[in-house]
Amino acid sequence: MGNGTSRVVGCFVPSNDKNGVDLEFLEPLDEGLGHSFCYVRPSIFESPDITPSNSERFTIDSSTIDSETLTGSFRNDIVDDPSFLNRHNSKGLAETTFKAISGASVSANVSTARTGNQMALCSSDVLEPAASFESTSSFASIPLQPLPRGGSGPLNGFMSGPLERGFASGPLDRNNGFMSGPIEKGVMSGPLDVSDRSNFSAPLSFRRKKPRFQRFMRSVSGPMKSTLARTFSRRSGGLSWMHRFFLHPETRVSWAVGKDGKLHGEDPESCLESNRNLQWAHGKAGEDRVHVVLSEEQGWLFIGIYDGFSGPDAPDFVMSHLYKAIDKELEGLLWDYEEPSEDNQLQPDQEPPTEENMCDPESISEQHSKSVVAESEEVMIDDISSLGNTDTQIADGPPGDSAGPGKKSMRLYELLQLEQWEGEEIGLKRYGGNVALNNMTNQVENPSTSGGGAGNDPCTTDRSALDGIPNSGQRHGTKKSQISSKIRRMYQKQKSLRKKLFPWSYDWHREEGICVEEKIVESSGPIRRRWSGTVDHDAVLRAMARALESTEEAYMDMVEKSLDINPELALMGSCVLVMLMKDQDVYVMNVGDSRAILAQERLHDRHSNPGFGNDEGIGHKSRSRESLVRIELDRISEESPIHNQATPISVSNKNRDVTSYRLKMRAVQLSSDHSTSVEEEIWRIRSEHPEDDQSILKDRVKGQLKVTRAFGAGFLKKPNFNEALLEMFQVEYIGTDPYITCEPCTVHHRLTSSDRFMVLSSDGLYEYFSNEEVVAHVTWFIENVPEGDPAQYLIAELLSRAATKNGMEFHDLLDIPQGDRRKYHDDVSVMVVSLEGRIWRSSGQYYPERKQKFNR
């Protein structure tokens, strides 16, 4: 219905089973367990605001394309409008290799505030959830919710059915209240849409709330909503605007400054172009952090999984800095930046007035001399009004979020100030038009007097003229000013809460002035373009390693400065797993024991699709696009085990199929494990510390860490960091050489036709799965539930295995509070990147025997 829901509905499994669980959310979803989210890549030629046709999600052999009508193909590069195709091809847009991203995280550790975030430590008004998620609107997410006891889903213990997830996640609006995405040159990192609804998957609330608090909130919010609605009904256009403000306080109203100096609603097309450049997602589960950034136009994908230990500071720091460091290092290797063309820049007479030229006498004389020549008093008054509007914007403060040159996002209290100024504007037109006109005319006729002293300052003259104008609504404006100050305080409190929930978005950048300058430069800065030369893959890997090195140096400097106040920072560290995909090139960098697994189809098992090239395929040429979609949907419905009651999914069938997939698929580990489980790592540490016979103690580095390489963990890298700790946390540090390093392993891989998907995860997944089991289970799940969420399925399987291993039921494990549950499983974050999209016709494309099996 225009909100992009159909784009992600394929991530969710429709449940038509009579035994399915009906979702009746009588209480808010609990976000403390974890999140499941997905991103389905749309066609780069479609508008993000237009619902994509289902036909663009299939792939049919190119022989079925009708070259005259451009129909009969489900490839993404075929569209119905040839002019639209040519128009977008002129921009040189790239076709990315990845098609869909599935992610899920589950927390086992309790949530702890970052040590450097003293405001969060002192705040006790909101309980920080152990898991949270935020993203642009292209991602759909929902908190993990276990099925009620006694309920049984088709595959796992979560209420994951895509229908349910689509319902629970709400409208997939194109906005977000947080501009916390990674900063990028020429591209705004946060959503820039004009819609005013929150993009969270579920409210940040919890199951167990005190009834008295709910009654208090209802008693307070009701009168305030009604009062503010009556006050601003003229501007807001009705109660619904205020209703959305209270339900979604993070949202902002976007405005743009036109050439006339007045505020106008932001152009949806301009927002569309800016928002399509970058999509991002941030997630946390316990001490795990997940960072996803992708660009549809440039054809690249960045995924970072940061598995922290001993505290959240290290993974939060990596979340805030590593992507930006990599982006900087890769300039000139994978992409480059070009300055905006002079044709797109404003002419000198079209430049918006600034704080300097507004007070420049010659500038004002030049502006208003045109109005005198036109001999129009109305034009003169409107010009003065537009000048006042611009002045008011600058006086209000720097723009909150720049969407481009001259654009700003306005919060509610800023709208109140704007309305108060409009009241003064009305008084200007009624009473002070002649006074202001005479003053400005005198300045034009006598330019020599405009530069004399402060008494003749044109800006002072304008302001004094405005102040002397009687305003019939002065008392009304005073009331609105009081309400504006109250709402400003409300906004500041909400911002402090968001700082606690998402510390990586705020706490490392405290100087607002610097951030504002960065945003202004960002909006008018250079534009990223594709690197046209030959890519040096070794240079790319070295650049990624340099980015990690510089990020750790900055973190260690920060820790060293804080040792006297927060010595526990020396204990905190993180494993780092980064995957950068650019077209068909995949670059992987890791330190620690998080893994990146590539699933490849064994060549001797590959089969061509039996539907390709036969009579049925030839018949497709003469059929319309819509009929082809219906044929494919009917075929999927018949072959899917979810809809085919004759082939129910049973445990025995699943185990047999998973075993067969282990023979047909191969797991290739692109990352390297850095832990004491690897003999080479143990030998390396002992050879570097021959004088210390206890460098490896109890299968851990100095008896403390299982990992042999990590980001942070300064107490095992510098003796002074170790000495700053309490004695109970110190180790016997011999010498000055570090026991662990942050030297990463880097790998480049060129994707081939046999590569199917990638699985990136923290080490918690491999406590219960081997690499081959992960690939086999994901392949089985995609084969049987092509619209499902494989990452969430892996999380459910892991929790089920953890419960079985410890002799308890699935729900009994989840009933164990976080912190205590860490005894049974670790924080786990999983990302599954499909390299060919959702496998709608996988039964025919991969294993033809599956089709005959379903038809029995």
Curated annotation (Swiss-Prot):
Domains: entry comment: The N-terminal domain (1-233) has a regulatory function and inhibits phosphatase activity. The conserved PP2C phosphatase domain (271-833) is interrupted by an insertion of approximately 200 amino acids.
Main location: nucleus
EC id: 3.1.3.16
GO molecular function, one term: metal ion binding
Occurrences of domain PPM-type phosphatase (ranges): 269-835
Subcellular location: Nucleus
Protein name, per record: Protein phosphatase 2C 32
Organism of derivation: Arabidopsis thaliana
Disruption phenotype: Loss-of-function mutant pol-6 (T-DNA insertion) shows suppression of clavata mutant phenotypes. The catalytic activity of POL may be functionally replaced by the activity of PLL1. Pol and pll1 double mutant is seedling lethal.
Modified sites of kind Phosphoserine: S152, S189, S201
InterPro entries given in the database record: PP2C, PPM-type-like_dom_sf, PPM-type_phosphatase-like_dom
